[in-house]
């Protein structure tokens, strides 16, 4: 009986497959500054460089400028935490809590640090 249960358990795990990233959903880089600036340029170059290693994935750059970067940051804070919406910000993000009174997100807990560019 134990052998039959073990074989059934193994058979059930064979149907499970690892999810591939990013799948069919595009990856969006949100740049909280106007198009044509240095942060926008870095995001566009990064998106182009990441296309091939990610198997030709669709990478978009979304400029959400305004309020010193807090509009774009808020957009990312409210996005689904699925790894498909990334924020490309600069040092202003670190000073925002002390300079902006009522930001609609928490800089230290609403974001997950991915890396430095």
Where are these regions (language model features)?
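Hydrophobic h-region of N-terminal signal peptides that target proteins for export
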Residues: 10-18
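Sec-dependent signal peptide recognition
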Residues: 2-7
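N-terminal (or domain-start) structured segment
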Residues: 18-116
């Amino acid at each position: 009986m134990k052998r039959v249960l073990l074989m059934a358990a193994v058979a059930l795990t064979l149907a499970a497959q690892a999810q591939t990233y990013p799948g069919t959903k595009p990856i969006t880089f949100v740049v909280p500054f106007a198009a044509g600036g240095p942060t926008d340029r870095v995001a566009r170059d990064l998106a182009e460089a990441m296309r091939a290693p990610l198997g030709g994935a669709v990478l978009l750059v979304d400029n959400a400028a305004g309020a010193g970067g807090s509009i774009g940051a808020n957009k990312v804070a409210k996005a689904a935490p699925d790894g498909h919406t990334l924020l490309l910000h600069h040092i202003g993000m670190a000073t925002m809590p002390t300079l902006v009174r009522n930001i609609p997100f928490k800089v230290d807990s609403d974001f997950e640090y991915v890396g430095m560019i």
